[in-house]
């Protein structure tokens, strides 16, 4: 059908152009137009009658015609016959085409059901179910997001709890260290107090002994040695450290209780939210509240850190102050020890000199008595006695040994020999 259709179009166009060319040569009679062909294609055919021929009876007079050649009538007759045959074929094809279309239409009518089912209700149900599925997916995705947020919040709370727990352990360790330091300082303070008390007792005993020796040696009553220790009462370090320890314990206990209560409340709230998801606004308000709580806890933690730092600085200053005081006391004690050693050496030297002087005094008194007896006239007995005494005195000498000792060691030793005539 398509091939015949294209052929008809081509042939009609060529014949039409031929007729139009001839029409320009002169006036002629045209046959009526013939319409036909498959698909309603118009075919126009124009041909000339013998009256339209030029003078001479043929197209070939005067010039040659490339289409008609010699006999134009026979050629036109041949063309008309061929056209008639072609038109008959076209009509036959049109009839066959119409029959085929009728058969196709009948076949379609036979195959089509008499009653079509109405699927509009099902389509509405399907669209509604699809919308419900989409809504369910959105709600499920929202719930998944809420669950993820809740898990992240729980992880954050667990991390914060672990951090607070580790901080608590660190504070406990520091408090334990401060307690040990306090105990050590208490022991050191007690030892120092005992040493100072012992040295005071020793100083009192030395004063008494010195007074006794001075009384024995007939020293003037106004010769006295007074040693005074000026100690300013300082702060009670044990009480300060005990107050600090109690304050730290109260802070740690309070923070532990607050964190435990807060964690339980948040865990219960998160469990309820996971079991039955609350609205988004409620979750947002809870998140804001938790953030505010977290910020408040951070501020409180920073305050506690600063307070701890201040207490540590105070403890360091207290240690430094008391160490300076202890050094001063040790220097004072060392100075008094040196003075006591010097005083002992002076007393021993004076005692030795006193003994030497007493011996000299005794010998002089004896010599004076002898001279008196000689002057009184007892010449014989006394001269013999005096000569014997003078002979004995020539060989008698008195040695005075003076020693200076520091911390039990002899530093300087002097020997003084005094000859006495008895």
Curated annotation (Swiss-Prot):
<keyword id="KW-0416">Keratin</keyword>
<comment type="subunit">
    <text>Heterotetramer of two type I and two type II keratins.</text>
</comment>
<feature type="region of interest" description="Head">
    <location>
        <begin position="1"/>
        <end position="71"/>
    </location>
</feature>
<feature type="region of interest" description="Linker 1">
    <location>
        <begin position="108"/>
        <end position="125"/>
    </location>
</feature>
<feature type="region of interest" description="Linker 12">
    <location>
        <begin position="218"/>
        <end position="240"/>
    </location>
</feature>
<keyword id="KW-0175">Coiled coil</keyword>
<feature type="compositionally biased region" description="Polar residues">
    <location>
        <begin position="1"/>
        <end position="24"/>
    </location>
</feature>
<comment type="similarity">
    <text>Belongs to the intermediate filament family.</text>
</comment>
<feature type="domain" description="IF rod">
    <location>
        <begin position="72"/>
        <end position="382"/>
    </location>
</feature>
<keyword id="KW-0403">Intermediate filament</keyword>
<dbReference type="InterPro" id="IPR039008">
    <property type="entry name" value="IF_rod_dom"/>
</dbReference>
<dbReference type="GO" id="GO:0005198">
    <property type="term" value="F:structural molecule activity"/>
</dbReference>
<dbReference type="InterPro" id="IPR002957">
    <property type="entry name" value="Keratin_I"/>
</dbReference>
<feature type="region of interest" description="Coil 2">
    <location>
        <begin position="241"/>
        <end position="378"/>
    </location>
</feature>
<feature type="region of interest" description="Disordered">
    <location>
        <begin position="1"/>
        <end position="35"/>
    </location>
</feature>
<feature type="region of interest" description="Coil 1B">
    <location>
        <begin position="126"/>
        <end position="217"/>
    </location>
</feature>
<dbReference type="InterPro" id="IPR018039">
    <property type="entry name" value="IF_conserved"/>
</dbReference>
<feature type="region of interest" description="Coil 1A">
    <location>
        <begin position="72"/>
        <end position="107"/>
    </location>
</feature>
<dbReference type="GO" id="GO:0005882">
    <property type="term" value="C:intermediate filament"/>
</dbReference>
<dbReference type="Pfam" id="PF00038">
    <property type="entry name" value="Filament"/>
</dbReference>
<feature type="region of interest" description="Rod-like helical tail">
    <location>
        <begin position="379"/>
        <end position="422"/>
    </location>
</feature>
<protein>
    <recommendedName>
        <fullName>Keratin, type I cytoskeletal 23</fullName>
    </recommendedName>
</protein>
């Amino acid at each position: 059908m398509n091939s015949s259709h294209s052929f008809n179009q081509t042939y009609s166009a060529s014949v039409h152009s031929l007729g139009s060319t001839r029409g320009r040569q002169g006036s002629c009679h045209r046959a009526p137009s013939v319409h036909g062909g498959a698909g309603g294609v118009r075919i126009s055919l124009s041909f000339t009658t013998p009256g339209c021929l030029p003078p001479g009876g043929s197209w070939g007079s005067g010039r040659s015609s490339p289409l008609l050649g010699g006999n134009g009538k026979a050629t036109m007759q041949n063309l008309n016959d061929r056209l008639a045959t072609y038109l008959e074929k076209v009509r036959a094809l049109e009839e066959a085409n119409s029959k085929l279309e009728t058969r196709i239409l009948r076949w379609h009518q036979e195959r089509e059901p008499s009653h079509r089912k109405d699927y509009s209700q099902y389509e509405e149900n399907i669209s509604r179910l699809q919308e419900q599925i989409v809504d369910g997916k959105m709600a499920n995705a929202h719930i998944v997001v809420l669950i993820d947020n809740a898990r992240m919040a729980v992880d954050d709370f667990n991390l914060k709890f672990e951090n607070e727990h580790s901080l608590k352990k660190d504070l406990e360790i520091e408090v334990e260290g401060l307690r040990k330091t306090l105990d050590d300082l208490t022991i050191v303070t007690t030892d120092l107090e005992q040493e100072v008390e012992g040295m005071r007792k020793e100083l009192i005993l030395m004063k008494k002994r010195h007074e006794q020796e001075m009384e024995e040696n007939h020293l003037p009553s106004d010769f006295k040695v007074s040693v005074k220790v000026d100690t300013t009462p300082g702060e009670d370090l044990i009480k300060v450290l005990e107050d600090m320890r109690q304050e730290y314990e109260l802070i740690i206990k309070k923070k532990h209780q607050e964190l435990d209560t807060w964690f339980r409340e948040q865990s219960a709230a998160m469990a309820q939210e996971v079991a039955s998801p609350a609205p988004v606004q409620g979750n947002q308000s809870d998140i804001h509240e938790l953030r505010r709580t977290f910020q408040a806890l951070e501020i409180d933690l920073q305050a506690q850190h600063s307070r701890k730092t201040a207490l540590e600085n105070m403890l360091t200053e207290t240690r430094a102050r008391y160490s300076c005081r202890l050094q001063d006391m040790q220097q004072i004690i060392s100075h008094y020890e040196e003075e006591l050693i010097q005083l002992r050496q002076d007393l021993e030297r004076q005692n030795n000199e006193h003994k030497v002087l007493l011996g000299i005094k005794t010998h002089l008194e004896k010599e004076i008595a002898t001279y008196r007896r000689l002057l009184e006239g007892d010449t014989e007995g006394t001269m013999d006695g005096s000569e014997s005494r003078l002979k004995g005195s020539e060989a008698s000498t008195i040695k005075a040994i003076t020693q200076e000792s520091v911390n039990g060691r002899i530093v300087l030793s002097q020997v003084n020999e005094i000859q006495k005539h008895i």
